[in-house]
Curated annotation (Swiss-Prot):
Keywords: Cobalamin biosynthesis, Glutamine amidotransferase. GO terms for biological process: cobalamin biosynthetic process. This is Cobyric acid synthase. Pathway: Cofactor biosynthesis; adenosylcobalamin biosynthesis. Pfam families: CbiA, GATase_3. Residues 258-458 form the GATase cobBQ-type domain. GO terms for molecular function: ABC-type vitamin B12 transporter activity; catalytic activity. Catalyzes amidations at positions B, D, E, and G on adenosylcobyrinic A,C-diamide. NH(2) groups are provided by glutamine, and one molecule of ATP is hydrogenolyzed for each amidation. The lineage of its organism: Bacteria, Pseudomonadati, Thermodesulfobacteriota, Syntrophobacteria, Syntrophobacterales.
């Protein structure tokens, strides 16, 4: 074993089976039991990312797990992050810093250079914590990818980690998935696998008792638990599968008792975790949509972050969404842009160096009087900012707003709209930098700061403005909702749910935690 930590790894029979959630649950459970715990995923591919206090970029799943463990996120918890920029390529981020855009073939050729990077990151965590909870990616036994494996059984061997194989019974084929996965393992890999968790059962777990017997008798491995599907716990999700689920909810809109907020679903959307806090506000219905005719009827439309602003803007123009959003604003609606969405709201976006696209220049929506140019260097910083924009977002100028920047472009105001925020610190260092723009009246504004809605005061001010403009007198805006308190409640609920349905004590004994 590397370092002093006891490792425990969750492997999956496929994507979206619940590895990330179970890893977060065990981070919380072991924290509650008095252990210092850190999450770890060697390589993550994600639409959403986060900036650490040191200015490093990492995947949001490990941020959630770190929060559940009660510790500050660090890039060692996710040393390699892949952010898709096209159908065939990704931006590769190593130890929190972007090293370039790679095609799949180029990345496979480069991957061997990352083994020691991953090992060193894991060793640092293992030396600092009692337990490291590791997470694999996708299926643990993709045989055609095994030669280049960095995140699944190769990582388990590197960390000498006992592994729990997780299967999703809701999608069907649980026996083939779990038993078939173990059959494809080498003898050493099977020896490292300590048991199964059957996840996402709809109904009474007791009705699967015969299934547990079949799995245990055919594999010789224990089933540590059968976890029911839950709806009473809400956790941030980071992959495109989750976004698809959210987009299908658009047909539920129409309530006069809630503020209706629509997020445009972009082909290269990123950091849609920016809207989790709004999604769980008691008086808000937040929905994702991608058809122009859906825009009217919302109280506000948000253009989210993008991994390819120019291509996404071209998409909006092609399918008519750009015209619809402008018409929505002209009819009295509120439009907000975050990061790439903020860039789209300007007069034009140019990319003379081909950073994102072969398109060198494209017209923006013209809702904010600014222009954006893409540059090779990437801004990644945690920031503290003050509101200076006034009208429409009445937050005290003394209220410190916290968030983070992740962007390749630089935007310059052409006059007209007012600066929205003044950034007063980046990665803990004092600065004086204006950010964002807001039109008089507050119906059009944008910012580069991700996580801006996580600030309770600003979010409440934004919603109060929407209520006033919408005339929805029945909306009662809950004053007591704290997003941070709400998240901690979800982590505790998750821990309770897993303790109820998984033999946590048995797992603890196996990994040496008595």
């Amino acid at each position: 074993m590397i370092g002093r930590a006891r490792p425990l790894m969750f492997l999956g029979t496929g994507s979206d089976v619940g590895k990330s959630v179970l890893a977060a649950a065990f981070c919380r459970i072991l924290k509650q039991d008095g252990y210092s715990v850190a999450p770890f995923k060697a390589q993550n591919m994600a639409l959403n990312s986060y900036i650490t206090p040191e200015g490093g970029e990492m995947g949001r799943a490990q941020v959630v797990q770190a929060e559940a463990a009660g510790i500050e996120p660090h890039v060692d918890m996710n040393p390699v992050l892949l952010k898709p920029t096209s159908q065939m390529g990704s931006q590769v981020i190593v130890r929190g810093r972007a090293i370039g855009n790679y095609s799949a073939q180029e990345y496979y050729e480069y991957k061997k250079n990352l083994v020691e990077v991953v090992r060193e990151s894991y060793e640092r965590l293992a030396a600092r914590y009692d337990v490291v909870v590791l997470e694999g990616a996708g299926s643990a036994v993709e045989l055609n990818l095994k030669e280049h494996d960095l995140v699944n059984l190769a990582m388990a061997k590197m960390a000498d980690a006992p592994c729990i194989l997780v299967g999703d019974i809701d999608r069907g084929g649980i026996f083939a998935a779990l038993l078939g996965s173990t059959m494809l393992m080498t003898p050493d890999e099977r020896d490292r696998t300590i048991g199964f968790i059957v996840n996402k059962l709809r109904g009474d777990p007791r009705l699967f008792a015969s299934g547990v017997d079949i799995l245990e008798s055919r594999s010789g491995l224990p089933v540590f638990g059968v976890v029911p599907h839950f709806d009473h716990i809400a956790l941030p999700e980071e992959d495109s599968v989750a976004l698809g689920r959210r987009a299908r909810r658009v047909e539920t809109r129409g309530s006069e008792d809630a503020l209706m907020v629509g997020v445009v679903r972009l082909p290269y959307v990123s950091n849609y975790t920016d809207f989790d806090c709004l999604e769980h506000e008691p008086d808000v219905e937040l929905l994702y949509f991608d058809r122009p005719e859906q825009v009217f009827g919302f109280d506000a439309v948000i253009l989210p972050g993008s991994k390819n602003t120019i291509e996404d803007l071209a998409f909006l123009r092609k399918n008519g969404m750009a015209e619809a959003v402008v018409a929505f604003y002209k009819s009295g609606g509120t439009v907000v842009g975050l990061c790439g969405g903020y860039q789209m709201m300007g007069l034009r976006v140019s990319d003379p160096h081909g950073v994102e696209s072969s398109i060198r220049e494209i017209a923006g929506l013209g809702l904010l009087d600014m222009e954006t140019e893409m540059f090779q260097d990437k801004v990644t910083s945690q920031v503290t900012a003050l509101n200076i924009g006034g009208s429409g977002l009445e937050v005290s100028e003394d209220d410190a707003l916290r968030g983070y920047e992740i962007h390749m472009g630089r935007s310059a105001s052409m006059g007209g709209a007012r600066p929205l925020f003044r950034i007063v610190s980046r990665d803990g260092l004092p600065v004086q930098v204006e950010d964002g723009l807001i039109q008089p009246g507050g119906r059009a504004w944008g910012t580069y700061i991700h996580g801006i809605f996580d600030n309770d005061g600003l979010r409440k001010a934004f919603l109060a403005g929407l209520k006033s403009r919408s005339g929805k007198t029945r909306v009662a805006l809950s004053a007591g909702f704290s997003y941070q308190d709400w998240k901690n409640e979800q982590y505790d609920r998750l821990a309770d749910h897993i303790r109820q349905h998984v033999d946590v004590k048995r797992i603890r004994r196996i990994i040496g935690l008595w």
